[in-house]
Amino acid sequence: MNSRDSFKIVVLGGGESGVGAALLAQAKGFDVFLSDKGALSEEYRSILRTHSIPFEEGQHTEERILAADEIVKSPGIPDKVPLVKKLYAQGTPIISEIEFAS
């Protein structure tokens, strides 16, 4: 297994729990990136910037997401979404925000 600082976690979904998961991943020493297909609130953008957590909104950069060692997925993102199907097909572990926090 990779050391924590090189273990790549992508958080899919930038709502309250997604931003919380990104902060937790960073606090645990992981290399974290947050991606949201929609727009983030200004509050969440500010939190991510303050903590120097890279993020994107309005898109999912497939190449970056598929390179993750683990995905923390918002429950609002269905498993039938093509990107999630690709992640499952390549064997990338996908866990919920609640699982990650426990």
For the regions a language model picked out, list residue spans one by one.
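N-terminal leader/targeting and accessory segments in enzymes
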Residues: 1-96, 100
